[in-house]
Amino acid sequence: MLSPERLALPDYEYLAQRHVLTYMEDAVCQLLENKEDISQYGIARFFTEYFNSVCQGTHILFREFSFIQATPHNRASFLRAFWRCFRTVGKNGDLLTMREYHCLLQLLCPDFPLELTQKAARIVLMDDAMDCLMSFSDFLFAFQIQFYYSEFLESVAAIYQDLLSGKNPNTVIVPTSSSGQHRQRPALGDAGMLDGVEASLFCQRLENLCDRHKYSCPPPALVKEILSNVQRLTFYGFLVALSKHHGINQALGALPDKGDLMHDPAMDEELERLLVQVPGLVNSITATSEASCLPSRTPPRVGSPWKPLHRSRKLDAESDGSTEETDESET
């Protein structure tokens, strides 16, 4: 059955809204790169499996960053995959540094940019040093806002800086993150950080921003709700409010509520099924957990039940680059 939303839109608008052309181009590229393997079971089956993986959100696993950020669905799928793969960090009560969270992100996306992880950590840490420890839930919800709304936040940072310096509000802001490189956020002075800007004026500028641009923005009504509760606010105060807002998390739809963050019955059942298939593994894990008094800083590496549709032949080269960056971060 076609949804009412689908029937209400012309075909070309629906295809553009759902980024169908992006997925068709990616599917054809994968088909050409793996044509020898795919020829064994047919092109029709390949396209069926590809678009099933898109619907399930597993198509972004181990892919390059440019693809992961290409569509809102890809971004939401990556957020959901990161949560499901590493929620044991939160269940164990582990606290990790920004660099350690970045290493986890690189396990799913080898070329994930460090700058984006740093920006997410700054929302949590504020004025604290970047090597401070963070809980999984704090980092995850901050990362969700920074990653999903990255272009919006770049423009918001420029608007905030303009308000601090009293510049003309008619300045047009053009995001440039399509290449995967993010413009450095303007340095905010100490006075600006303490005093912030007038919330009502900031709200007007953000309403105009959402009307002008077509990239992903938080629901304007919820942004207005946040800003209506204060007279003045700082840039990072605004980001913290976004990351903790229940309605914005629901509107984005990638993560559960904070109270349900550690519960994923479907994944638990799948992991139990996989563990049972490995002789002696369950007993070994049980014995290890009983012998240990403190939770490990490093979560156990349990094989993900997800499998990429077709492992790219470039994965080894990408992984080598990821290892080098990880080694540098540890030195």
From Swiss-Prot:
Positions of the UniProt region annotated as Required for interaction with TPGS1, LRRC49, and TTLL1: 1-225
Region (Disordered) residue spans: 292-331
An example molecular function term from Gene Ontology annotations: protein-macromolecule adaptor activity
Stretches the record annotates as Required for interaction with TPGS2: 112-331
Coiled-coil region: none
InterPro entries in alphabetical order: CSTPP1 (IPR038968)
PTM annotation (Phosphoserine): residues: S319
Gene Ontology biological process: regulation of protein complex stability
CDD domains: DD_C11orf49
Biased composition (Acidic residues): 318-331
Alphabetical UniProt keywords: Cytoplasm, Cytoskeleton, Microtubule, Phosphoprotein
Signal peptide: none
Organism superkingdom: Eukaryota
Location of the region described as Required for interaction with PCM1 in the Swiss-Prot/TrEMBL record: 1-111
Any one Gene Ontology cellular component term annotated for this protein: centriolar satellite
Compartments reported by the entry: Cytoplasm, Cytoskeleton, Microtubule organizing center, Centrosome, Centriolar satellite; Cytoplasm, Cytoskeleton
Subunit text: Interacts with PCM1. Interacts with TTLL1, TPGS1, TPGS2 and LRRC49; the interactions link CSTPP1 to the complex TPGC. Binds to alpha-tubulin.
Role: Regulator of the tubulin polyglutamylase complex (TPGC) that controls cytoskeletal organization, nuclear shape, and cilium disassembly by balancing microtubule and actin assembly. Regulates the assembly and stability of the TPGC and thereby modulates polyglutamylation of the microtubule, which antagonizes MAP4 binding.
Family statement drawn from the similarity comment of this UniProt entry: Belongs to the CSTPP1 family.
Protein name per the record: Centriolar satellite-associated tubulin polyglutamylase complex regulator 1
Organism this protein belongs to: Rattus norvegicus (Rat)
Phylogenetic placement of the source organism: Eukaryota, Metazoa, Chordata, Craniata, Vertebrata
